[in-house]
Amino acid sequence: MINTEGTKSLEAVDIEELLSILPHRYPFLLIDRIVEIDGEQQAIGIKNITINEPHFMGHFPAKPVMPGVLILEAMAQTAGAISLLRLGNKQTNLVYLMTVDNAKFRKPVIPGDQLKIHVRLLKKRSGMRRFSCVAEVEGVRVAEAEIAAMIIEAE
């Protein structure tokens, strides 16, 4: 299927395919699936937050809150996954996070929440990508940022 921008729309991506695309593994694979993809232009990733995640042992034991930096990493993994999917060469490239700008954390993310991560490509130049990212829980914005990443060939 081709959309109006001429980029290929892809099927949703489950955890098995994410494992074949991204190098991240437990406890640092921070997306469970991608439910909507429009080529490399935009996507929606899902992260189900559970009390069993190791960061909750210390952040914070009496009132667990997902660290903001891990929300940013989930955004980066969603953006990286769609960039690598578009290239079509799984595990032959890596995506490195280069910058995070205008990060804002608006509400805490706690166990039981489902984080919905919206990423939208803002700029593409050679191996560089810039994305606008928004994380929501039940339709309420909990975090946002702009990120830049570089795609490099894996050695």
Curated annotation (Swiss-Prot):
The keyword Cytoplasm applies. It catalyses: a (3R)-hydroxyacyl-[ACP] = a (2E)-enoyl-[ACP] + H2O. It is found in: Cytoplasm. GO terms for molecular function: (3R)-hydroxyacyl-[acyl-carrier-protein] dehydratase activity. One of its GO terms (cellular component) is cytoplasm. One of its GO terms (biological process) is lipid A biosynthetic process. The active site is at H59. InterPro entries: FabA_FabZ (IPR013114), FabZ (IPR010084), HotDog_dom_sf (IPR029069). Keywords: Cytoplasm, Lipid A biosynthesis, Lipid biosynthesis, Lipid metabolism, Lyase. Gene3D superfamilies: Hotdog Thioesterase (3.10.129.10). It holds the Pfam family FabA. Its EC number is 4.2.1.59. Involved in unsaturated fatty acids biosynthesis. Catalyzes the dehydration of short chain beta-hydroxyacyl-ACPs and long chain saturated and unsaturated beta-hydroxyacyl-ACPs. Belongs to the thioester dehydratase family. FabZ subfamily. This is 3-hydroxyacyl-[acyl-carrier-protein] dehydratase FabZ.
